[in-house]
Amino acid sequence: MSKSFKLHSEFKPAGDQPEAIRKLEEGLENGLAHQTLLGVTGSGKTFTVANVIADLNRPTMVLAPNKTLAAQLYGEMKEFFPENAVEYFVSYYDYYQPEAYVPSSDTFIEKDASVNEHIEQMRLSATKALLERRDVVVVASVSAIYGLGDPDLYLKMMLHLTKGMIIDQRSILRRLSELQYSRNDQVFQRGTFRVRGEVIDIFPAESDEWALRVELFDEEVERLSIFDPLTGQLQHEVPRFTVYPKTHYVTPRERILQAMEDIKVELAERRKVLLANNKLIEEQRITQRTQFDLEMMNELGYCSGIENYSRYLSGRGPGEPPPTLFDYLPSDGLLIVDESHVTIPQIGGMYKGDRSRKETLVEYGFRLPSALDNRPMRFEEFEALAPQTIYVSATPGKYELEKSGGDVIDQVVRPTGLLDPLIEVRPVATQVDDLLSEIRIRAAINERVLVTTLTKRMAEDLTEYLEEHGARVRYLHSDIDTVERVEIIRDLRLGEFDVLVGINLLREGLDMPEVSLVAILDADKEGFLRSERSLIQTIGRAARNLNGKAILYGDRITASMEKAIGETERRRAKQQAYNEERGIIPQGLNKKIGDILQLGQPSTRGKGKGRGGKVADTNNYQSLAPKALDQKIRELEAKMYTHAQNLEFEQAAELRDQVHQLRQQFIAIS
């Protein structure tokens, strides 16, 4: 019997949530393909969606526009569904340079990539959950529309082991090698196996916490046990176990041999075309490269850049969509598109950028034309494959509104009673000095400020100016990677600094209840960064604070400003009426400062340094004498460096914060 979703929350739906949940469920049960939930910042959109998932009990994919937001949603869904499978599926590249050719300088750039092993394990865990159970929520980025191994081949390659099964050791080892597991009797890690006599230990590729022990006796599986790979301690026996391939791209030998024949046929045709056009260098290049790949595939079962032959390996025809995560989602699955006004255009844009780069590679003989089918889904293919969909946004785009027939489900009232920020329009002439005085007021009462500018140059100059005048300020720009960006946002919330300056980086979905002021410089300059949607999203960053306020600096009120102010005031009035009717006093959000960085770091479970373990509060050291306090600082610093050497950056960061506080305490009492 399939397990049901069980929602854990100390809250019950309130405000506009019960009505939104009822309408969404009604629409899904009536077979509506598209619905739009217009939920303002802080209205509990994720909680509403979690209730819908739990009530309908259907496997669900949640699409987010970027890794940061996907990580935040993953953390929230894990809290709502601790007993169910909540999975995380984003690009596993920490760094990715696709192969490319620049004809103007005759430069070929080899593919170069760095894979995050922990995220690869989470991707494998996500597809395994979708294949094995129905109580699954997969939080994914737009990586979900990129090619993945064919689910049919993936299922065929699995190794099923059952207690009492007749199979010899050699057969198991051969099958493990076909699944791309490697034997390593010294270092036992994910995706490896080791052999000790009649005992085979397998560390599944999708696991980071446990491994499988297979005990054989006279060509029979005598016992299957789950054990802790770190301590070796047996946890429990299982009657059967399925070993999944180490990678999504694993392919049976017979399919590889068939693919090789098809590649040879295409190569012969391509050579004729190139020779007919007198492209001798390109003909020599494609022949040499393809024959080398064929030789590797014959010997090893794979080659570098094998994804460029994915059309043959998956058995799909020219122009057909590649297999993606959507192929793993059951037909009655549910799709939630979060921050849909950003996510939907992203899906549409991925295919075109990929296509132009590949066409150059094909034209100059670096790849066969079939490589063009190793691509993300086209938008129309996404539309055809997507199951019943709920678009979630505070500012839905034209596409979502059209698809849902203009019928939008409003979730404007917040259960906490929090009102939308007050909006003031102030002149541009004095914007910098006015902003500085506002920052000082907020810093004095331990609140944070977000400032958005129009250009990178202005952001840099403003940051420098604010620093010179004593403000604790940081600048967030496009060169900062995902992990560092998360650290900056975390440090802002912790009070390491008071002001964050950005351009277009602080809009959708990020929870920062400590931010009480959003300042939008040059708000009267019409354009993408100052459109109605951008303004509403930016203003919304202050909507989680009791004293939320937005200052728009402009010498005139543009049409976009007028619409954004009008919509914010409409929402504010609706919330105010709700509060008065029910006697609700607005309450600020007290959201704990979690750390989503662990998504990119391996688990430290079992090492006595679990991620859940909180660093001791500095209040515990208030009574220490200066000498004892100095000793404690040295101890914590030593621990911090040990964590950093072990790549346990989350614990190191927590200790760094604690050492910083203790140093201030030490200075105060010295």
Curated annotation (Swiss-Prot):
Pfam families: Helicase_C, ResIII, UVR, UvrB, UvrB_inter
Domain Helicase ATP-binding: 26-183
Gene3D superfamilies recorded: P-loop containing nucleotide triphosphate hydrolases (3.40.50.300), UVR domain (4.10.860.10)
Chain ranges of the UVR domain: 630-665
Region: Disordered, residue numbers: 600-620
Similarity comment: Belongs to the UvrB family.
Protein name: UvrABC system protein B
The encoding gene: uvrB
